[in-house]
């Protein structure tokens, strides 16, 4: 019988540790307090106030936008109200406590769409503007999909037919999204062509926040695989997951399954065992 090996020392373990990431100029990551993209720190006139744990979908929307546009910015983290008390310093700056917020040259803006409108004015849109006709149509579709998901996930069904109706309503809207995705051979919704190929645009950013959460929550609470049931959505998600800008913000299934109930007021499974 071989003798038990002594545990490795910290010095020995350090040899096997991964090199520390460059949080400022490297890949997108949730730990940064400053992002420069190899530009001067003097260009970082935007400060993003987001939640501590990268759980807030609307913070994620602004975060991805800044990363895709490579806009230098600073990050300050704040507690979401459904998980604890707001920091007093933040309430002095934003009395409502709303997240996300950005600060540009002492001007504070809240509401994720309003933030993106301001950023578009300064830095230009990500592909098509949020106010362009087609993007407005996509934004309405996203709200329709969100509503059908909430109705299925967050409202308890009293009998099987009610549960099935909610499921079919969600599938109907999800297929409408798939029909839109099929129109774009690149797999994106509002892509912009760059020297490196096709990148997502404004409507992609609007959709990804809650589709990421739908994918996790419906699997966990309803046993419904969004990606298997909707292959065009799956392709679109795969394309986004190849991007470091998105992947650095992406939450895992366990996180979303358990961070959503406090935010949404509850998530319900359905059992017909009775």
Task: Place the predicted regions along the sequence by residue.
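GST superfamily/GST-like fold recognition
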Residues: 195-222, 232-234, 240
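Long, charge-rich low-complexity segments
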Residues: 244-274
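Short alpha-helix boundary/capping motifs
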Residues: 93-95, 233-235, 261-269
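Acidic, serine/threonine/proline-rich low-complexity intrinsically disordered regions
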Residues: 159-165, 219-228
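Extended, well-ordered alpha-helical scaffold segments
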Residues: 165-173, 227-242
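GST-like domain detector, emphasizing the conserved glutathione-binding G-site
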Residues: 1-196, 267
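Short amphipathic alpha-helical segments embedded in low-complexity Lys/Glu-rich regions
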Residues: 78-84, 193-196, 224-228, 253-259
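Substrate-binding/catalytic groove segments of enzymes
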Residues: 183-188, 215-220, 246-249
């Amino acid at each position: 019988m071989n003798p038990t090996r002594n545990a490795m020392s910290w010095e020995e373990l350090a040899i096997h540790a991964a090199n520390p990431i460059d949080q400022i100029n490297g890949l997108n990551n949730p730990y940064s307090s400053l992002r420069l993209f190899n530009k001067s720190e003097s260009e970082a006139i935007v400060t993003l106030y987001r939640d501590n744990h990268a759980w807030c979908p609307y913070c994620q929307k602004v975060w991805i936008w800044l990363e895709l546009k490579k806009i230098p910015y600073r990050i300050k983290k704040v507690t979401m109200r459904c998980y604890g008390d707001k920091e007093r310093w933040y309430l002095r700056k934003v009395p409502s406590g709303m997240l996300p917020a950005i600060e540009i040259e002492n001007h504070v803006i809240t509401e994720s769409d309003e933030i993106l409108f301001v950023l578009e004015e300064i830095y230009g849109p990500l592909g098509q503007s949020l106010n362009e006709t087609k993007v407005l149509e996509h934004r309405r579709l996203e709200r329709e999909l969100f509503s059908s998901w909430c109705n299925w996930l967050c409202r308890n069904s009293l009998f099987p037919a009610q549960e099935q109706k909610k499921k079919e309503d969600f599938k109907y809207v999800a297929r409408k999204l798939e029909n839109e995705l099929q129109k774009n051979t690149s797999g994106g919704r509002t892509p912009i062509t760059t020297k490196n190929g096709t990148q997502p645009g404004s409507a992609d950013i609007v959709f990804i926040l809650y589709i990421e959460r739908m994918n996790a929550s419906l699997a966990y609470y309803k046993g419904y695989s969004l990606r298997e049931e909707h292959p065009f959505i799956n392709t679109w998600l795969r394309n986004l997951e190849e991007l470091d800008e998105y992947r650095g913000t992406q939450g895992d299934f366990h996180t979303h399954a358990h961070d959503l109930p406090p935010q949404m007021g509850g998530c319900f499974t359905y059992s017909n065992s009775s």
